[in-house]
Amino acid sequence: MKSPEALDAALQEIPAGCCVIVPLKIEGGALLYQSQVKGAVASGACKDATLTIREIAESIQSHQLSAIAKLSLLDDAYYPTYDTTAGFLLEDGYSRWLDNKPEKGGKPWMSPFSDSAAAYLQALTAEIMQAGFQNILCTDLDYPHFYDTDLELLGSPVQSKQNRAEGLIRVLNGVHQTASQQGGGAMYTFSLYDALNRDAEALQPVMLNTPSAVVYIDPNSFRDSFWHNNQKISMSGLSMQEKLQVLMPIAQELCGDMHLIPCFRERSFRQQEQTQAEAWLRENGYTQYMFK
């Protein structure tokens, strides 16, 4: 999104009536639009952006497309460098945690326990929604890798599984509440493979206010067998469509009452397999799905 002309050329390739997912906050915390949020400007998060959020939204709307903003929530080094209270602090209350030694390029991460971090994400959400985006697709709602020594220095908030989950859910629900005030909402994203390996820490549908979940599914990740609900499920020898028939009900179960939008890894499918998969999805009532 370096210029209005480049954006317009890209949008012309998309059929009218489709939905466009636009990455606006990427891993590392950089913004791909000129923000007016004080923390975004002061931290340098949008220093390389050229287009305003309204220019992006209006260009999408002019092509009769719906706009969804994709935001990397917590993988952010810009804002907690500017405001240290937005990052992880050690138990002493002022020393900040970095993901490596400073001389090796160590950087901070946004903490889900920080009021400042939550306020920053909600301010960005409000700015984006007010420009004309319909929904917020939330990614990177997770923690950096902590070594045992890190956990000791950071203390109970990151040691307790329940505290960890509640911190992530608080951030997501805050973004959703802000988006819903503008007539939209936030969508939770998680990998089915991660969820089955207990790595999707925020996946507690009863506590989540988000109405929809985008679930990343790569059938090729399930080559042998896996456990679910104390049952060993074998995937060996199954066709792509047979794998789909096994995995989709599990994904729906994990989503609870949230509306499931499956997102499949396109490179895992041959063309015929994708055609068959799309037909099966439609036959089974899945009108919203993605291959990417």
Language model regions located:
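Active-site-adjacent "subsite" loops/lids of carbohydrate-active enzymes
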Residues: 1, 74-126
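The substrate-binding groove and active-site-proximal loops of carbohydrate-active enzymes
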Residues: 1, 37-50, 104-119, 157-164, ...
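Catalytic domains of carbohydrate-active enzymes, especially glycoside hydrolases
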Residues: 5-32, 127-138, 208-216, 283-288
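Aromatic-lined carbohydrate-binding/catalytic grooves of carbohydrate-active enzymes
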Residues: 17-50, 152
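Active-site groove signature of glycoside hydrolases
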Residues: 19-27, 109-113, 117, 121-150
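Aromatic- and acidic-residue-enriched segments that line the glycan-binding/catalytic groove
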Residues: 34-42, 76-101, 144-159
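Aromatic-lined carbohydrate-recognition surfaces of secreted/lumenal glycan-active proteins
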Residues: 66-75, 137-140, 162-201, 252-271
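Substrate-binding cleft of secreted/luminal carbohydrate-active enzymes
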Residues: 210-292
